[in-house]
Amino acid sequence: MSAYCGKYKDELIKNAAYIGTPGKGILAADESTGTIGKRFASINVENVEENRRSLRELLFTTPGALQHLSGVILFEETLYQKTKDGKPFVDVLKEGGVLPGIKVDKGTVEVAGTNKETTTQGHDDLGKRCAKYYEAGARFAKWRAVLKIGPNEPSQLSIDLNAQGLARYAIICQENGLVPIVEPEILVDGSHDIERCAYVTEKVLAACYKALNEHHVLLEGSLLKPNMVTPGSESKKVSPQLIAEYTVRALQRTVPAAVPAIVFLSGGQSEEEATVNLNAMNKLSTKKPWALSFSFGRALQQSTLKAWGGKTENVVKAQKAFITRCKANSEATLGTYQGDAVLGEGASESLHVKDYKY
């Protein structure tokens, strides 16, 4: 049997290509209730549904922001929320030319017999949930697998389990009309150098595409959300140019040209760092058969959160910070970012959280 060729085939290909439109990218606004609670705690805002809804309304209704986005990943709660005027968020996004997406994994669990390595859960009722989310207006999905670099990590067992898990998720999504974003995140935690990260990234991506192929996933109707290839968090920083070279080379060696776009996660980099590194990749004159774009959460929201602080009177100021980051990242997808964005408070601070849970 070849790749998926069911009733959603053409729609999947069209939507995946649209998400990869040059000049656009993805806002990851799918933080779980627990994760957004930690963000709110940093700005002294109570973690209740109305505050979560208010933040997301602030983001989705920022004048001019949606033109820089092709997709927004939502948490299940947000998929069904509305603006204070009663308009469903899904409609706000669609009218702004943005595809709604949905986080479908149910978090990680430790793999017995390993050194605290994890696999991702959520397959059991996935088909049913995907059908329900499609009905509610979602057109793509996200599933995060987490791997770590250590003296003996990632183990082959962890690589295989996570690659198989991502592939199973991807084909179930496609059978239900959702473009799967395949996210094998290799955490930045550790003191490893950039060469070690490149080696592990290539190994993990090769395993993922082997598994995707074995599960008959339609690559043209899928997207990849990888980490950038960088030194570990306890290692000396390197230039954006070096990060760009190592990252693009790892992708050239492992990601088939059939994949329409690669949307990077920010992995705890500061807002500005993530943008500058993406820009450096798009400036490289080498073979890049896929669009290179962004799927940023923290790196699109940090200065916005700081400016907002949970106060209605700060909404306009916060939206200004948000549009600044959207525009900067839009330019980075074209390799035209000049590093001239007005940096809001928090734009330069590292957003790294050890052993990050989403």
Swiss-Prot record:
Top-level enzyme category: lyase
Documented EC number(s): 4.1.2.13
CDD domains referenced in this protein's UniProt entry, alphabetically: FBP_aldolase_I_a (cd00948)
This protein's UniProt keywords: Cytoplasm, Glycolysis, Lyase, Schiff base
A Gene Ontology molecular function term of the record: fructose-bisphosphate aldolase activity
Keyword Repressor: no
Compartment(s) of residence: Cytoplasm, Cytosol
UniProt-annotated catalytic positions: E183, K225
Catalytic activity from the UniProt record: beta-D-fructose 1,6-bisphosphate = D-glyceraldehyde 3-phosphate + dihydroxyacetone phosphate
Site (Necessary for preference for fructose 1,6-bisphosphate over fructose 1-phosphate): Y358
UniProt KW Lyase keyword: yes
Stored NCBIfam families: FrucBisAld_I
Similarity-based family: Belongs to the class I fructose-bisphosphate aldolase family.
Subunit structure, as described in the record: Homotetramer.
Function: Fructose-bisphosphate aldolase that plays a key role in glycolysis and gluconeogenesis.
Name assigned to this protein: Fructose-bisphosphate aldolase 3, cytoplasmic
Organism per entry: Oryza sativa subsp. japonica (Rice)
